[in-house]
Curated annotation (Swiss-Prot):
Belongs to the UPF0298 family. It is found in: Cytoplasm. InterPro entries: DUF2129. The keyword Cytoplasm applies. GO terms for cellular component: cytoplasm. This is UPF0298 protein RBAM_014860.
Amino acid sequence: MENKRQGIIVYLHSLKHSKMLRKFGNVHYVSKRLKYVVLYCDMDLIEKTMEKISSYSYVKKVEPSYKPFLKLEFESKLDKAKEYDYKVGI
């Protein structure tokens, strides 16, 4: 059985504390230049986890990832340029 997962983006003042975020979920990515951590945890625990993480002094901002709520199936539409055949009259 797979649990639904959702990402949390945590902006930090310093990357020194990025290892401490492992206890909240799986650390997927750490950006050294922009000082943020992408963390994955269970979708039903996301609100509690965000409140807990934002209470720490080394955390600047916490944002949820909206990827699970996006529609990823796209409709294939033809280009307008390819739709018309301009060489018919020649």
